[in-house]
Amino acid sequence: MVDSLIDFYLQSNGVTLFVLALLAVYFIALNWVFYYRYFSLNSWASKESDSLEALLMGSANVASDAYLSHFIKTSSTLNKELFDLGMYAATKEATKGLSLLSVVASTAPFIGLFGTVVSILDTFDNIGGASGTMNIIAAGVSDALIATAAGIFVAIFAYTYHQILKRKSFEVSGLIRMQRDALLSKSGHGA
């Protein structure tokens, strides 16, 4: 296994290795963003869920660590505009990192394809300089396709992570929206 990796490294085009290194950096970054945001959103959703539960059990106001509490403290009256501002700010905060995952999901296959094209061009150049047997062609194309496979691999994770975080963000926004509606109905302003 290690010998195969060393052979691949020694025989591959520099651009292909650069593409694989770039995709590795992409993969590390998207995993960091995903796990950081996932655990942050989980913690946030738990706080909002507890605050909503307290409201539904008769509490007059949201919990002090609930997102809307910051907006409620700044105003003497509860109104829809104040809560709309809070909802917008919460949605913006909850969706942080999604654009990075989206960019990685859409660009990773193209980066891999770029490495493949350059590697295939290098293979054709080597075929022109030597007697091109089928073994030389197959080996060159095989090495070239590794970059595309790596790009698709990274994109699959980025897209999956994007969808998971998008759903978690929607959950947090929904919990905040329910708190807003409960507060407005208690104050007589309606939702």
Each model region followed by its residue ranges:
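Alpha-helical transmembrane segments
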Residues: L22-W32, I111-F114, V118-L121, A155, ...
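Residue-level signature of catalytic and energy-coupling elements of molecular machines
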Residues: N13, N31, P109-G112, V141, ...
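Predominantly long cytosolic amphipathic alpha-helical stalk/bundle segments
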Residues: F39-T133, T160-A191
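Hydrophobic alpha-helical transmembrane segments of polytopic membrane proteins
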Residues: A144-T160
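Transmembrane alpha-helix/interfacial motif
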Residues: F8-D50
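Alpha-helical membrane-interface segments at transmembrane helix boundaries
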Residues: I6-N13, T91-A105, A138-I146
